[in-house]
């Protein structure tokens, strides 16, 4: 039996969001028992650390109002990309703990570098209430956590689109969203132009989660050789995950999210993952972080029976 190896990469970065607190997300997830859960699942934890250091002075000036805190985000995400690429090169599963969703710039760049040199089609499962498909021209806030996926597809500031290596990181036609329910006008138009696939909460209400889940699995089996899962806890209804950066009503239930992770695990396509925007400042008895651990476990092969 092949040994299962995992590298847990903590990214306590919240420069990409207007509401701070997600920098404490990795600690909350660790305290919720992630290490023990991974060992119970038979994983060899080859690394569990934080590769970045945040200087408090970096909070004093956000710089470009169209892409706030661009420089510290770039620096951190380049480091993350290196960590992710190194892990997959060594047949180690990189699990990234955010932090806000701007860290996806680094995660996706790292797994993309691996995919390109191994001639693999990279797919992205983007489980998020939001599109994160703004650019510096369309963003109403200038917060980079709302621009990260567009940049990974080649849209936006060159500082972001060319992060880690020059050029597009993922074909937008290989991206599938689940649980979307809040899009800005500009990003909606860009998403349509780019050709991403979106299964919104309206689709889930209209057709039922089971039917949508089947479509998600079919999508990745036909569009990808490897998949990166990018899971933002705000996709969940605040009833189940109150401790997120931007809680929105009418989201996924915990059961739906857990089943999605379990079904993705069964595809044997998932090569890397991140879970982001756990905000302990807004949480209740750490329940959001506890649920994050359960979601990670299902994605990594945990079964009820």
Task: Describe the predicted segments one by one.
Residues 182-193:
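Short, glycine/polar-rich helix-capping loops at beta-to-alpha or helix-loop-helix junctions
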């Amino acid at each position: 039996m092949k040994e299962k190896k995992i590298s847990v990469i903590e990214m306590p970065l919240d420069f990409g969001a207007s509401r701070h607190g997600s920098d404490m997300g990795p600690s909350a997830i660790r305290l919720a028992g992630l290490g023990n859960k991974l060992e119970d699942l038979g994983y060899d934890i080859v690394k569990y650390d934080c590769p970045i250091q945040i200087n408090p002075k970096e909070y004093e000036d956000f710089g470009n109002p169209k892409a706030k805190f661009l420089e510290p985000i770039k620096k951190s995400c380049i480091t993350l990309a290196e960590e992710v690429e190194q892990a997959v090169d060594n047949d180690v599963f990189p699990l990234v703990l955010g932090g806000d969703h701007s860290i996806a710039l680094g995660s996706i760049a790292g797994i993309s570098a691996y995919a390109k040199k191994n001639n693999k089609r990279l797919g992205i499962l983007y489980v998020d209430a939001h599109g994160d498909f703004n650019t510096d021209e369309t963003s109403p806030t200038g917060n980079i956590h709302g621009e990260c996926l567009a940049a990974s597809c080649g849209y936006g500031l060159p500082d972001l689109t060319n992060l880690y290596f020059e050029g597009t990181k993922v074909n937008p036609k290989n991206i599938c969203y689940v649980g979307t329910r809040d899009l800005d006008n500009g990003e909606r138009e860009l998403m349509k132009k780019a050709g991403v696939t979106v299964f919104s909460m309206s689709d889930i209400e209209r057709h039922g989660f089971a039917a949508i889940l089947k479509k998600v699995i079919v999508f990745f089996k036909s569009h990808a050789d490897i998949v990166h899962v990018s899971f933002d806890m705000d996709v969940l209804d605040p009833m189940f995950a109150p401790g997120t950066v931007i809680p929105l009503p009418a989201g996924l239930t915990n059961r739906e999210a857990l089943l999605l992770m379990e079904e993705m695990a069964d595809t044997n396509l998932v090569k890397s993952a991140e879970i982001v925007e756990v905000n302990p400042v807004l949480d209740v008895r750490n329940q959001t972080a506890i649920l994050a651990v359960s979601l990670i476990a299902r994605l990594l092969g945990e079964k009820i029976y």
